[in-house]
């Protein structure tokens, strides 16, 4: 396994093509395939996980709802939110699912600390929280020992659509974002800091930017 973790910077892309691409990547990767992390922003979309219940979709309105194959309940993605899809061979890395989730949470907590924001994880509700409000969501799927889906960090976005759902299945869960706690915020800088933290917490030595498309 390489000691270099590859990142793809996808910019802003619709959710479904990226989801289908990560499914293909996971289904077709061989034992020699290198791990990748895809960084992306999505146009407004609700995604409903495998445990999702219809009653948690309160008033989706004109925002599309996509039923997906990750764990967890419903969440929202939109512009100003940094999404990282972790396409990892967790068998080679030697991580259990709980260990991987803990590493993802630690990565986010340290990133937020670099902006002077104190955040914490909750043992019974995966994700990262600031003063009880959720700032980052996690959702994974493991197939053939490899992960896909990942994490979403609210950076500087319109949080109003979260009020149209029970985020992650919790009625009335308060949501927050980095720009509410630290200014000024540059999205590209947050992305760079996230990359560095993922390299550290996934036990890689270096990172590189991958070129080419995902389809």
UniProtKB/Swiss-Prot annotation:
One Pfam match: LplA-B_cat
GO biological process, one term: protein modification process
Residues the record marks as site: Lowers pKa of active site Cys: 134
Binding residues for substrate: 70-77, 137-139, 150-152
Any one GO CC term of the record: cytoplasm
Molecular function via GO: lipoyl(octanoyl) transferase activity
Repeat found in the keyword field: no
Reactions performed catalytically: octanoyl-[ACP] + L-lysyl-[protein] = N(6)-octanoyl-L-lysyl-[protein] + holo-[ACP] + H(+)
Entry keyword set: Acyltransferase, Cytoplasm, Transferase
Subcellular location: Cytoplasm
InterPro entries per record: aa-tRNA-synth_II/BPL/LPL, BPL_LPL_catalytic, Octanoyltransferase, Octanoyltransferase_CS
Functional description taken from the UniProt entry: Catalyzes the transfer of endogenously produced octanoic acid from octanoyl-acyl-carrier-protein onto the lipoyl domains of lipoate-dependent enzymes. Lipoyl-ACP can also act as a substrate although octanoyl-ACP is likely to be the physiological substrate.
Full protein name: Octanoyltransferase
Transmembrane segments: none
Residue ranges of domain BPL/LPL catalytic in the record: 31-206
Active site (UniProt): 168
Organism: Pseudomonas fluorescens (strain SBW25)
EC number: 2.3.1.181
Pathway in which the depicted protein is active: Protein modification; protein lipoylation via endogenous pathway; protein N(6)-(lipoyl)lysine from octanoyl-[acyl-carrier-protein]: step 1/2
Family classification: Belongs to the LipB family.
Miscellaneous comment: In the reaction, the free carboxyl group of octanoic acid is attached via an amide linkage to the epsilon-amino group of a specific lysine residue of lipoyl domains of lipoate-dependent enzymes.
